[in-house]
Amino acid sequence: MQKDASSSGFLPSFQHFATQAIHVGPEPEQWSSRAVVLPISLATTFKQDSPGQSSGFVYSRSGNPTRNCLEKAVAALDGAKHCLTFARGLAATTTITHLLKAGDEVICMDEVYGGTNRYFRRVASEFGLKISFVDCSKTKLLEAAITPQTKLVWIETPTNPTLKLADIKACAQIVHKHKDIILVVDNTFMSAYFQRPLALGADICMCSATKYMNGHSDVVMGLVSVTSDDLNERLRFLQNSLGAVPSPFDCYLCCRGLKTLQIRMEKHFRNGMAVARFLESNPRVEKVIYPGLPSHPQHELAKRQCTGCPGMVSFYIKGTLQHAQVFLKNIKLFALAESLGGYESLAELPAIMTHASVPEKDRATLGISDTLIRLSVGLEDEKDLLEDLGQALKAAHP
């Protein structure tokens, strides 16, 4: 059991997680060299034994030894039977929606990553899909939104950037009253270490591996994990047909990142909690949002559903947009940048940066105001992070 999580009342850590992260996938026995580090297979094509008879690989878009090792590793960490990798998180999203046809309806969480919102609102809707944005944290609203045409429900938990939670198990029970609806959970913020959506009833667990799963801000990638053989076959066909697969080198980097996922996430949790507590006690801060804090309205759900919390902390600085901008101008350790989940600490202003594509009216409804600041708390020394935040807050409010 993870010490920090268990002492805070969260679920115990998933058994054998670190061992699987290190050993599942690139087993040395599969290579003639017995290399203990995953080899990078850059070949685009593979020699066949006879016409139409291969030894497992034909063309790198359809399958690659390095990519296969990563997919095997992620499947184990997600508690899944299968995993598919994609060139981007949005490539994974696009591929999933190709399971549908024109006229089908998608229910999407009202608050999601800005790129997901933009894709559903401005791209998928142009191809005959009907998109409804619903607050799926309120299960009655989800149930009321389902129609005979609903074929996919997309939830993100915690949401980006206000860290609202959806009860995955409750959503799954509602969705699966209807046999032909697929429940997708975007698990980017939690990673496989803190949350396993498939075990809670989701049909598809997807995430942007760009963030915590890789953890080094040097790979852009999407992951999709499933337990259903049927879904795997359909998605595997689409993966090959659409061709949005990652490079072997990126697969190598991500597989390497997984080796330290456990120790990284534990440090993110410790630092995230320390930052959240510091901000909550600071008079220059209006409100702090962090599922690990008892003040979070869904703190109990977080403890039932997760083994801990990542380093994502959002807060409202007192004042106006100008105060937020002065704060962001004065941070030193926290880099002003989009993205999240790397070893380095980042800060951003969602209303102007990651969620600028969300309509202003929707941002106001969701609480994405000009004073909302999102932090991705990294792995630096806790004391240094708190000092940096403290001096930047003082600069914003002398």
Curated annotation (Swiss-Prot):
Optimum pH is 8.0 with L-cystathionine. Transmembrane segments: none annotated. It is found in: Cytoplasm. Keywords: Amino-acid biosynthesis, Calmodulin-binding, Cysteine biosynthesis, Cytoplasm, Lipid metabolism, Lyase, Phosphoprotein, Pyridoxal phosphate. CDD domains: CGS_like. One of its GO terms (molecular function) is L-cysteine desulfhydrase activity. The modification N6-(pyridoxal phosphate)lysine is found at K211. Substrate binds at R61, Y113, R118, E338. Pathway: Amino-acid biosynthesis; L-cysteine biosynthesis; L-cysteine from L-homocysteine and L-serine: step 2/2. The keyword Transport does not apply. GO terms for cellular component: cytoplasm; cytosol. The modification Phosphoserine is found at S50. Catalyzes the last step in the trans-sulfuration pathway from L-methionine to L-cysteine in a pyridoxal-5'-phosphate (PLP)-dependent manner, which consists on cleaving the L,L-cystathionine molecule into L-cysteine, ammonia and 2-oxobutanoate. Part of the L-cysteine derived from the trans-sulfuration pathway is utilized for biosynthesis of the ubiquitous antioxidant glutathione. Besides its role in the conversion of L-cystathionine into L-cysteine, it utilizes L-cysteine and L-homocysteine as substrates (at much lower rates than L,L-cystathionine) to produce hydrogen sulfide (H2S). Homotetramer. Interacts with CALM in a calcium-dependent manner. Belongs to the trans-sulfuration enzymes family. This is Cystathionine gamma-lyase. It comes from Rattus norvegicus.
